[in-house]
Amino acid sequence: MQLSLLKAKIHRATVSHSELNYEGSIAIDGLLLEAAGLYEFEKVHIWNVTNGARFTTYAIRAEHGSGIISVNGGAARYVQVGDLVIVAAFAQMSEDEAAVFRPNLVYVNAANAMTHTNHSIPTQVA
């Protein structure tokens, strides 16, 4: 059986640009792309924390260290500059692979500078 697990997440990034007439995609600061282990043109899910919108697109590289998170093309209609978003990607793997797999979790500040990384999420308590 193949399972779909969270591969990577960039948590609560701030949309810095929104380019409706640019060819589709989300441009992500190259430093964040690498820290998350995301590839250019990889399918990513975007979850807008600010307005609840959810959509998929593909990642492209923005300038390394620029802090750019730019939602482009038709997807630009789902965000506004300043919105908080989560960028996530999933990977298919066997049960044996899933038993030892840990995702790349990247956390950023309001300027989209990486603050820290992790490979697990704390247990939620009441």
From Swiss-Prot:
Biological process terms in GO annotation: alanine biosynthetic process; pantothenate biosynthetic process
Pathway(s) this gene product operates in, as recorded in its UniProt entry: Cofactor biosynthesis; (R)-pantothenate biosynthesis; beta-alanine from L-aspartate: step 1/1
Chief localization: cytoplasm
One Gene Ontology MF term: aspartate 1-decarboxylase activity
Keywords: Autocatalytic cleavage, Cytoplasm, Decarboxylase, Lyase, Pantothenate biosynthesis, Pyruvate, Schiff base, Zymogen
Domain of life: Bacteria
Subunit structure: Heterooctamer of four alpha and four beta subunits.
Family indicated by similarity: Belongs to the PanD family.
Name listed for the protein in its UniProt record: Aspartate 1-decarboxylase
